[in-house]
Curated annotation (Swiss-Prot):
InterPro entries: Ribosomal_bL33 (IPR001705), Ribosomal_bL33_CS (IPR018264), Ribosomal_bL33_sf (IPR038584), Ribosomal_zn-bd (IPR011332)
Swiss-Prot/TrEMBL GO biological process terms: translation
HAMAP family: Ribosomal_bL33
Gene responsible for this protein: rpmG
Domain of life of the source: Bacteria
GO CC aspect terms: cytosolic large ribosomal subunit
Protein name: Large ribosomal subunit protein bL33
SUPFAM superfamilies: Zn-binding ribosomal proteins
Amino acid sequence: MAKAATIKIKLLSSADTGVFYVTKKNSRTKTDKIVLKKYDPVARKHVEFRETKIK
């Protein structure tokens, strides 16, 4: 059986509020860590969310 191309990842807020989004990425084409600006409802502003592993 072949390895799956997409993996689930967690995007954790850089504002240290504990807010995270769960999304998926293609691990074959996107080898570097994802950094996105998304809304943090606890901080009530847009902050950077960095990719971490789902435990």
